[in-house]
């Protein structure tokens, strides 16, 4: 301007001496904590998304890449996020997340039981997910007890055996969905062996040597009955891997030959906490799976939307099946046979305990893993607990996990009292078939002919919930599983003590209660 004579020499000298720095806008402190589970998890999820976008642009299939190729795309995605000034919007509710971190700091010690891993570490680790049932949004999570001590994210990155939490997802749910069982069907709970002759170890001796209902089998998490149901499911559907092929694969469970093993219903297959939480989300969402997600939107530095989450969901179970499973899983929590979660919660917060809680526990061999997953109509909250390096815990590990989870849920309630949808209920879907059945057989009451003798089904009647077809007519071999001697024992020991005059019931099984 001076050379163009637009300003005088005096003005030019004054301008040169002026400190321009004082007019610069101050650098804003980014509201990002770059140390911790949250930062690294959000970044990793964003990198996965950008990788997929880049591969799509290049018309490259992820499955066709070797590890070197995947590493190259990952590095490219990380550079792209930084160089393009991407803004990542996550689903995490900061208040919820902070509350969960405070809760694990305050109550994580409840998990400790004095056991140690091979390195002498006595801290019992945990991974927790809080998921919105309707959308699959991850509202908050706990990656571990202390990031400074252990950076392994136990909610997302640690695959562990799932134990009995898989039973509703892979066996009872599909069997109800296919009309093979109803809520009060009878299942053999007699000592037995695997097909290869190995002795079968049950989870408890409660109600052994009899036929138990589906509801009671879940309440006590019996092992023998669920294997019988799974074998019947595989036989009737003509597919040893039916549950995975038609249910689990739709919910992104990891593919494994082990799903076809006879012992698969006991939870020997490994997966992570977020995947298992997602399975229960589907049941709590009327059978509709919404894939868990943490990234809502990614925009570049010009405001252009690079990615936005969209998911129409997948109907995995029928609404009838999901509602029956929730009715059964409510009994699991209310009975407190396998978890003290609800009684503990009632002592901490009776109002929160009045929410409609459903859920399932799980333990693995030598108590190396302890699981508890609970849902209300609005959210699903999960917990895995165990040593970072797999090692046995004590038999109290399940109670410890239930105690910890009750305190975690209570803390979340005070952070957001609307979170758990207190007052909302899991209702039976209108399509559920309500069959009047004999308590003795779990099938429709009526006359039975065996060895030339004709007699009526003994005992009282009850209602069994079916998603398909309704209860069959009672037969001598009424249950799922069991040998000839098991049936002879059951009929011989129990039938004489039951009332055999069921004429008042015989006329009811043809009424339209099975609709």
Where are these regions (language model features)?
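Conserved catalytic neighborhood of penicillin-recognizing serine enzymes
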Residues: 28-30, 181-244, 261, 301-331
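Periplasmic/cell-envelope proteins involved in peptidoglycan metabolism and beta-lactam response
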Residues: 2-30, 79-156, 165-168, 182
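Active-site SXXK
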Residues: 1, 100, 136, 161-189, ...
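A penicillin-recognizing enzyme superfamily signal
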Residues: 90-115, 130, 141, 148-158, ...
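Mid-domain, small-residue-enriched loop/turn segments at the edges of structured enzyme/sensor domains
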Residues: 199-201, 234-280
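Ser/Thr/Gly/Pro-rich low-complexity, disordered linker/stalk segments of secreted
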Residues: 493-515
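Non-catalytic, structured segments within soluble enzyme domains
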Residues: 2-87, 91, 249, 263-264
């Amino acid at each position: 301007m001076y050379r163009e004579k637009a300003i005088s020499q005096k003005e030019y000298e004054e301008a040169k001496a002026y400190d321009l720095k004082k007019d610069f806008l101050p650098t804003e402190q980014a509201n990002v904590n770059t140390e911790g589970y949250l930062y690294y998890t959000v970044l990793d999820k964003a990198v996965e998304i950008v990788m997929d976008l880049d591969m799509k642009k290049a018309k490259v299939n992820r499955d066709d890449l070797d590890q070197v190729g995947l590493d190259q795309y990952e590095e490219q995605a990380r550079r792209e996020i930084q160089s393009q000034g991407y803004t990542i919007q996550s689903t995490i509710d900061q208040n919820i997340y902070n509350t969960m971190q405070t809760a694990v700091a305050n109550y994580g010690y409840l998990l400790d039981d004095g056991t140690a891993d091979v390195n002498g570490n006595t801290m019992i680790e945990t991974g927790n997910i809080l998921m919105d049932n309707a959308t699959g949004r991850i509202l908050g999570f706990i990656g571990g007890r202390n990031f400074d001590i252990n950076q392994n994210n136990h909610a997302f990155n640690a695959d562990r055996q799932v134990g009995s939490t898989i039973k509703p997802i892979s066996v009872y749910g599909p069997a109800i969905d296919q009309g093979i069982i109803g809520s009060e069907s009878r299942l053999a709970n007699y000592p037995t062996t695997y097909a290869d002759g190995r002795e079968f170890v049950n989870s408890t001796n409660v109600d052994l040597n009899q036929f138990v209902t589906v509801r009671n089998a879940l309440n006590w998490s019996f092992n023998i009955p669920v294997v019988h149901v799974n074998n019947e499911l595989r036989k009737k559907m003509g597919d040893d891997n039916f549950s995975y092929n038609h249910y689990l694969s739709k919910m992104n469970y990891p593919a494994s030959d082990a799903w076809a093993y006879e012992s698969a219903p006991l939870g020997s297959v490994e997966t992570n906490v977020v995947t298992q939480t997602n399975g229960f989300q589907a049941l709590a969402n009327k059978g509709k799976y919404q894939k868990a997600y943490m990234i809502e939107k990614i925009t570049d530095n010009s405001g252009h939307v690079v990615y936005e989450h969209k998911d129409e969901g997948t109907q995995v179970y029928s609404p009838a099946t999901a509602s029956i499973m929730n009715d059964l899983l409510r009994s699991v929590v209310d009975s407190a046979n396998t978890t003290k979660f609800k009684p503990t919660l009632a002592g901490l917060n009776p109002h929160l305990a009045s929410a409609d809680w459903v859920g399932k526990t799980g333990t693995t061999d030598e108590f190396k893993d302890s699981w508890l997953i609970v849902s209300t109509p609005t959210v699903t909250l999960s917990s895995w607990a165990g040593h970072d390096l797999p090692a046995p815990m004590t038999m109290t590990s399940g109670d410890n996990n239930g105690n910890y989870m009750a305190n975690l849920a209570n803390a979340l309630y005070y952070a957001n009292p609307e979170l758990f949808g207190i007052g909302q209920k899991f209702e039976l879907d209108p399509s559920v078939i309500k069959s009047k059945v004999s308590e003795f057989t779990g099938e429709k009451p009526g006359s039975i002919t065996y060895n030339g003798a004709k007699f009526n089904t003994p005992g009282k009647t009850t209602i069994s919930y079916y998603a398909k077809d309704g209860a069959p007519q009672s037969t001598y071999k009424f249950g799922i599983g069991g040998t000839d001697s098991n049936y002879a024992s059951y009929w011989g020991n129990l039938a004489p003590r039951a009332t055999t005059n069921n004429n008042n019931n015989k006329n009811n099984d043809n009424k339209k209660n099975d609709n």
